[in-house]
């Protein structure tokens, strides 16, 4: 780039900074922040006890790849684990 272009870019950048500074001066940046502690974990609905579905275990074990004699799912340990 030539010297003229560099000076033009510097001048435009300075104008942008000046305009931005003018806008910032209109805001009160010295105000205090407010913090809120919310005890409610689920604000969309009431928490209720979960009902278990007795058919779930049976259906789950049907689609499991391998189940032992006690009725537990047998899984392969990841090769990346020691």
From Swiss-Prot:
<comment type="function">
    <text>Allows the formation of correctly charged Asn-tRNA(Asn) or Gln-tRNA(Gln) through the transamidation of misacylated Asp-tRNA(Asn) or Glu-tRNA(Gln) in organisms which lack either or both of asparaginyl-tRNA or glutaminyl-tRNA synthetases. The reaction takes place in the presence of glutamine and ATP through an activated phospho-Asp-tRNA(Asn) or phospho-Glu-tRNA(Gln).</text>
</comment>
<comment type="similarity">
    <text>Belongs to the GatC family.</text>
</comment>
<dbReference type="InterPro" id="IPR036113">
    <property type="entry name" value="Asp/Glu-ADT_sf_sub_c"/>
</dbReference>
<dbReference type="GO" id="GO:0050566">
    <property type="term" value="F:asparaginyl-tRNA synthase (glutamine-hydrolyzing) activity"/>
</dbReference>
<keyword id="KW-0547">Nucleotide-binding</keyword>
<dbReference type="GO" id="GO:0005524">
    <property type="term" value="F:ATP binding"/>
</dbReference>
<keyword id="KW-0436">Ligase</keyword>
<keyword id="KW-0648">Protein biosynthesis</keyword>
<dbReference type="Pfam" id="PF02686">
    <property type="entry name" value="GatC"/>
</dbReference>
<dbReference type="GO" id="GO:0006412">
    <property type="term" value="P:translation"/>
</dbReference>
<keyword id="KW-0067">ATP-binding</keyword>
<comment type="subunit">
    <text>Heterotrimer of A, B and C subunits.</text>
</comment>
<dbReference type="InterPro" id="IPR003837">
    <property type="entry name" value="GatC"/>
</dbReference>
<dbReference type="InterPro" id="IPR010120">
    <property type="entry name" value="Glu-ADT_subunit_C_archaea"/>
</dbReference>
<dbReference type="GO" id="GO:0050567">
    <property type="term" value="F:glutaminyl-tRNA synthase (glutamine-hydrolyzing) activity"/>
</dbReference>
<protein>
    <recommendedName>
        <fullName>Probable glutamyl-tRNA(Gln) amidotransferase subunit C</fullName>
        <ecNumber>6.3.5.-</ecNumber>
    </recommendedName>
</protein>
<dbReference type="GO" id="GO:0006450">
    <property type="term" value="P:regulation of translational fidelity"/>
</dbReference>
């Amino acid at each position: 780039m030539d010297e003229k272009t560099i000076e033009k870019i510097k001048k435009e950048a300075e104008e942008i900074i000046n305009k931005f500074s003018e806008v910032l001066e209109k805001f009160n940046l010295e105000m205090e922040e407010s913090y809120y502690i919310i005890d409610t974990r689920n604000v969309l609905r009431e928490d209720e006890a979960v009902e278990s579905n007795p058919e779930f275990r049976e259906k789950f074990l049907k689609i499991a790849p391998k189940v032992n004699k006690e009725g537990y799912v047998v899984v392969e340990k990841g090769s990346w684990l020691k």
